[in-house]
């Protein structure tokens, strides 16, 4: 388990509560999604949970999300099609793909289908928060 750097920790403390960082969590298991979302919301992120690729695409039509967190089965062709569609809909969003095996082959598949980074399942909420904070530093340098 990695520890967030001091810079990232200070960024979380300074995060403005009226300006949440919107993220979309695509997780078919709503119990897991609710648990992860509560940890992210406690850290100051605005999380929208969607249980299917279709509902996630619909949500993207209504709002812009700085980050897309996708729980994916890379062996499922429909999942890869969904990753492509999510990337086309939000080319500037940062896409984090969580999969059971995050090896070099999985990273290559994820990058080919529009993902920016790969994390292993089960998701470590602290690691995910550190990654989102690091992205937020790059996305909003005026903070």
Say what each PLM segment does.
Residues 1-39, 43, 66, 88, ...:
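Non-catalytic signal-transmission and effector/linker regions of two-component phosphorelay proteins
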Residues 61-63, 85-92, 113:
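Conserved phosphotransfer cores of two-component systems
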Residues 81, 101-118:
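Alpha4 helix (beta4-alpha4-beta5 surface) of REC/receiver domains from two-component response regulators
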Residues 92-104:
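A short, hydrophobic beta-strand element within the central beta-sheet of small alpha/beta folds
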């Amino acid at each position: 388990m990695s520890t967030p750097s001091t810079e990232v920790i200070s960024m979380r403390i300074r995060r403005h509560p009226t300006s949440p960082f919107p993220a979309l969590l695509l997780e078919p298991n709503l119990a897991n999604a609710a648990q992860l979302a509560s940890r992210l919301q406690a850290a100051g992120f605005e999380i929208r949970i969607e249980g299917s690729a279709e509902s996630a695409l619909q949500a993207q039509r209504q709002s812009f999300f700085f980050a897309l967190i996708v729980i994916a089965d890379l062996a499922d062709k429909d999942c890869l099609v969904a990753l492509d569609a999510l990337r086309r809909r939000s080319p500037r969003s940062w896409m984090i793909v969580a999969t059971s095996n995050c090896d070099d082959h999985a990273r290559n598949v994820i990058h080919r289908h529009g993902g920016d980074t790969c994390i292993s399942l089960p998701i470590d909420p602290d690691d995910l928060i550190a990654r989102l904070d690091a992205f937020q530093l790059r996305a909003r340098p005026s903070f």
